[in-house]
Amino acid sequence: MDHKSRMLLDTIFKDMLNTKDVYALIKYIFKKDPVETIFSKKDDDIFIDFVYNDNVLASDYLGMKTTKVEDCCSCRKVVAVEYMNTSIIDNDLEGYIKQSDKLKRFIKLYNKNNAIKKARNIKSRQKMLKDAGIDDIGYEFIKDAIGLISRK
């Protein structure tokens, strides 16, 4: 992933997407497939995760702290469902993206340079406010501000 997509994932789409969504976005925008498919665990929630060329997991792009599941036999049902969902994405990538408002919005904002610049400015302002001790302004502010920009 490039800087623009990471900026969007870290600001506007923070905690909104999952690893399958990141998989679909990378496959659609960058035409890249993962090197390896693994299963990760976060707070007793097991999900599919993807390792890319730079040894970064899809969950890392989302800022998730996860651990690798070593024994997939103990969670066979989850493994089967996750593989089935991934094959559905592979069979109809554009359909998967079109049915998701979040993914359509991500791609729309990714293609707008103005939205990326404003996200960068808002993020730097948020950092300055945090350094000044004002913690009340969070990611919701950024999401709302960029949402207004994307409507123009």
UniProtKB/Swiss-Prot annotation:
Keyword Membrane: yes
Induction comment: Expressed in the late phase of the viral replicative cycle.
Transmembrane segments: 22-38
Pfam families: Pox_H7
InterPro entries: Poxvirus_H7
Principal place of residence: membrane
UniProt GO cellular component terms: membrane
Location of this chain's protein in the cell: Membrane
Keywords annotated in UniProt: Membrane, Transmembrane, Transmembrane helix
Domain of life of the source: Viruses
Membrane topology: Single-pass membrane protein
Family: Belongs to the chordopoxvirinae H7 family.
Function: Contributes to the formation of crescents and immature virions (IV).
Name this polypeptide is given: Late protein H7 homolog
